[in-house]
Amino acid sequence: MVKSLAVERAGSSAIRDLLEITEQPEIVSLAGGLPNPATLPTDAIARAAAAALEDDPLGALQYGPTEGYRPLRRWVAGRHGLAADPHGEEHVLVTSGSQQALELLTRALVDPGGLVALADPAYVGALQALRAAGVDLAAIPADGDGLCVDALADRLATGERPALVYVVANFDNPSGSTLSAERRVALAALADRYGFWIVDDDPYGDLRWHGEAPVPLRELTDRTITLGSASKVLAPGLRVGWAVAPVEVRRAMTTLKQSADLHTSALTQQIVHRTLAEPGFLEGHLVTLRTTYQAQAEHLVGALRTKLGDRMTVPEPDGGMFVWAELLDTTADSAQLLDPAVAAGVAFVPGAAFGVERLHPTRMRLSYATADAASLDLAVDRLAGVIPAP
């Protein structure tokens, strides 16, 4: 049996394991944060692929620079407020999905045994990457306004010194919360005072349909590193993500990426750039995504409140892809409900999958992004047959 220390530390992702189960056609999955298939812009991607192979076949099919395709890096820099900087792309590293960006960043800035602070509950992929790197985790409470920055401040005051503070500031995964404007200012001030890096993982920021987005953390302190991805706004199968960071951090990550995979696929980078940079495409596509996900979110929340309102509380999302539902029975354990739910033909992610120190037994993450209205209704009917009535 082959099992290194890194494998043991990382563990298996509950969500990735569930995806294999939910590929079965009889199961309605509320588990993975997969884009709705109807929203995937296949025609635009096909045009971009054909253009890349016709206009620049060598650039699309040959080895490329580790930093990434320069036109894509310039586009990302512009989206992150660096359009006026003639060397803005020097802050951008293109990665094989934002998951690789987090893994490289952790290796670049935190030695094994170093400390990383993050909300509890936390994104499963982040937990895997951080644990595989052998860092220690400081679990910080979170609520409807995101990471409790005052609790972090208390930990800092006692002498704890995280190298990184990881947040999903816009529509946190799994909780769906957005870090409030006041807490962003406070977190930025703490970073400047204590010298840690803020890692703002932002795959969902463009998927907002209610309210105004708070000021990005990167505009509040230069100790912010922003991670982004084409997965949620274009297509996850292209596996293109990025990090926007101070140049010295980007260079350190580039060195590590050279030893990992040399560079992200040149062809998919060109496809992503040509698609996203096509005049008028992104604005129209984001309208489609927001309209679709808002309708699906409202449909799922309405169905859950109608059929399971006596058994769970369900918040109303303002964006993103998830509902962080809570069972009203304080003795319940959502992990114990998963096998019966799958047997009944519906899947979700138990709260325990997101736990840093706590298990969140009464919580479950439900994604409304993938399924259509009829499938969401069916999923709720099946859940109603599994979750005990009061």
Which residues does each PLM region occupy?
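N-terminal small-domain helix-loop-helix segment of the aminotransferase-like
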Residues: 8-97, 104, 278, 347, ...
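Short, conserved charged micro-motifs
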Residues: 331-337, 374-378
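Active-site PLP attachment segment
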Residues: 206, 219-252, 264-267
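Structural signature of PLP-dependent enzymes
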Residues: 253-258, 278-302, 330
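Conserved core of the PLP fold type I
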Residues: 59-194, 205-223, 293, 322
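Conserved glycine-rich beta-strand-loop-beta hairpin in the small C-terminal domain of fold type I
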Residues: 291-301, 313-326
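PLP-dependent enzyme catalytic core of the Aspartate aminotransferase-like
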Residues: 343, 358-390
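Conserved PLP cofactor-binding pocket of PLP-dependent enzymes
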Residues: 27, 203, 342-365
